[in-house]
């Protein structure tokens, strides 16, 4: 990964590209790369959908190697949803393929004057940027179906659906899985809208004829990878829970904890949660003959994904993740897994974030457009997004826009981005992360749910503010570093609980680059990323007053614990004091 | 006294989802767990939706929820 591809979509006479040496960005991967380029090169006051914004796509620093779990790809830009810096990452095949092609980043710059739609093809022989207006208005599934006949079987696809073309604020970028289904999304923050603004419909990556990236010290690398995989396999979360039940194993846990946001964050318990739980989902999938364990990218040993089929055994979607099951399920009072799976498919097909879309539907229910629990109504609403009707465009711009248009006060967002499946009143640690992360409400930015609820990586009382600031700080630093390696964030469970697995990862990175890496180096990397992101957001106009939860979380106690969010503003302002 | 015991994930296999049990006063979470020969360690314990430790003494009418270590997100 010694080069960067820059495509100027706004060049006179049509897009041009140049391949540059990686230069000052050498050694960076994933979020470290996207953040470094955006913070240095994008004007913080630019319009996110304008020519001044850039879309940076970067494989992790270990992607394309034999390292297990290294298939995350990061996409960065100034977010049209939050107005701040954005890094959104996804699994699928793209990271491994792009890394083997030798690109540390693709940077899409400028925007075309014309209405033409482009595709970008990259293989070992070079880069081709071409007009393909036959792709206009295609949702992700038919789009990939049409493209895959034209390219090698090894190709991976990064695409936008109709939502991205319409530049909706919750639009995602889809990455294909090993079966070439557009199921893994850089979902958060509207990165798909930025790709749409640049009129790029598809990026096709083909690594035919290329090999895995070789480590500097192959023997040490192999040994470290073996110890790393052993650690993942022996940890109960990555070795048992996730492969058996997928991420939706959390529904019952959060519901039992009284922290499962129900009916647009009115209560912390959903009476029908059991019906949409991971346990019931897994049973149903096995009964119907779906594929019970599946990796979203080659080289994954956790295999938390599944193929979800209908009662006739016909493909519906990939197994909806916990956050999706919640956003379209309990958050909307919906208790039917088939309805949720259909909504997951629609989101993937149109290319929108499942969390912001589910939260928008919840807000629409709060506004009285349809009642809570109305599954058929929720499907109709999400179909409006695909049709591009005025209502669909509002919903496809996420919960905040929907709340503003329909006059709703209870809108669960920070910096314009919807919260995930944990109420910040009854899991105060995640409230600190939602409030303070540079990304807008984002549970993955510092997953305090681990020590608060799951008792992994520490033990804090979720109903008390004590210790939450320090925990969120440490997790935000560690996460920024992990997001730069291309590693799936689920490795954090064994990493935090098993020092020898953390050491194995350090050894593996070290052996790849032929250096010795320590925990302090990882911390320093994480801090440097957060510092760049905070600095960008400050220059974009963000102040400490944006690091706050909506006031209703401080005023309305949530049952069953009847608590409000109790971390003080003064303490929230200490998260980035290190 | 009566307590409701709920099991989740792998702990359900060959056992039950929910069971109401008659237990003597002074029964702790450990007493209940030990009698079930669960596969693997107990990860998360809730008594009436609050985290509890194995030595927690149950009261009449309590709901005890027992999970292995699970995660996602």
Can you say where each PLM-predicted feature lies in the sequence?
Chain B
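Ubiquitin-like/PB1-type beta-grasp interaction modules and other compact soluble beta-rich domains
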Residues: 1-72
């Amino acid at each position: 990964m010694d080069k960067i591809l820059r495509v100027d979509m706004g060049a006179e006479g049509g897009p041009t590209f140049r391949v540059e040496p990686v230069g000052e960005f050498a050694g960076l991967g994933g979020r470290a790369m996207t953040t470094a380029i955006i913070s240095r090169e994008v004007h913080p006051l630019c319009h996110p959908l304008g020519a001044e914004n850039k879309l940076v796509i970067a494989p992790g620093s270990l992607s394309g190697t034999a390292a297990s779990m290294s298939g995350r790809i990061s996409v960065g830009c100034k977010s049209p949803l939050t107005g701040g810096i954005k890094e959104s990452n996804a699994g699928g095949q793209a990271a491994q393929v792009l890394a083997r092609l030798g690109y540390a980043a693709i940077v899409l710059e400028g925007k075309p004057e014309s209405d033409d739609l482009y595709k970008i093809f990259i293989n070992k022989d070079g880069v081709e940027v071409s007009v393909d207006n036959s792709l206009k208005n295609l949702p992700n599934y038919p789009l990939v179906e049409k493209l895959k006949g034209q390219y090698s079987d090894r190709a991976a696809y990064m695409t936008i659906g109709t939502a991205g073309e319409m530049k909706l604020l919750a639009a995602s970028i889809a990455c294909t899985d090993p079966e070439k289904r557009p199921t893994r999304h850089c979902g958060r923050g509207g990165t798909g809208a930025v790709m749409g603004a640049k009129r790029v419909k598809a990026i096709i990556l083909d690594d035919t004829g290329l090999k895995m990236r070789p480590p500097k010290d192959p023997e040490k690398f192999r040994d470290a990878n073996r110890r790393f995989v052993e650690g993942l396999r022996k940890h109960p979360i990555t070795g048992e829970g996730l492969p058996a039940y997928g991420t939706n194993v959390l529904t019952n846990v959060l519901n039992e904890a009284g922290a499962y946001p129900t009916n647009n964050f009115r209560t912390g318990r959903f009476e029908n949660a059991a019906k949409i739980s991971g346990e019931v989902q897994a049973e149903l999938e096995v009964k119907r003959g779906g594929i019970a364990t599946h990796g979203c990218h080659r080289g994954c040993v956790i295999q938390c994904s599944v193929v979800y089929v209908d009662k006739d055994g016909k493909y519906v979607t990939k197994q909806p993740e916990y956050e999706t099951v919640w956003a379209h399920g309990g958050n909307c009072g919906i208790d039917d897994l088939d309805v949720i799976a259909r909504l997951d498919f629609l989101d993937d097909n149109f290319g929108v974030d499942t969390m912001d879309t589910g939260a928008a539907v919840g807000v629409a229910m709060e506004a009285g457009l349809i009642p809570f629990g109305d599954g058929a109504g929720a499907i109709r609403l999400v179909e409006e997004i695909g049709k591009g009707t005025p209502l669909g465009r509002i919903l496809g711009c996420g919960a905040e826009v929907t709340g503003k248009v329909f006059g709703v006060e209870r809108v669960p967002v920070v910096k314009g981005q919807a919260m995930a499946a944990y109420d910040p009143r009854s899991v105060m640690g995640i409230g600190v992360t939602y409030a303070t992360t540079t990304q807008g409400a984002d549970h993955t930015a510092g997953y305090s749910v681990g020590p608060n609820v799951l008792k992994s990586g520490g033990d804090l009382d979720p109903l008390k503010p004590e210790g939450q600031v320090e925990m969120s700080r440490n997790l935000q630093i560690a996460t920024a570093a992990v997001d730069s390696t291309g590693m799936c964030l689920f490795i954090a469970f064994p990493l935090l609980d098993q020092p020898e697995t953390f050491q194995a990862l350090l050894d593996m990175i070290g052996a790849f680059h032929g250096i010795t890496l320590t925990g302090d180096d990882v911390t320093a990397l994480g801090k440097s990323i957060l510092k760049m992101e905070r600095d960008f957001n400050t220059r974009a106009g963000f102040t400490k007053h944006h690091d706050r939860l909506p006031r209703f979380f401080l005023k309305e106690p949530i049952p069953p614990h009847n608590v409000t969010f109790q971390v003080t503003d003064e303490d929230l302002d200490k998260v980035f004091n290190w | 006294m009566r307590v409701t015991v709920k099991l989740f994930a792998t702990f359900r296999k060959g056992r039950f989802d929910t069971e109401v049990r008659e237990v003597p006063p002074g029964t702790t979470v450990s007493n209940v767990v030990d009698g079930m020969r669960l596969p693997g360690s107990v990860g998360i314990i809730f008594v009436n939706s609050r985290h509890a430790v194995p030595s927690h003494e149950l009261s009449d009418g309590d709901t005890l929820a027992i999970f292995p270590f699970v995660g996602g997100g």
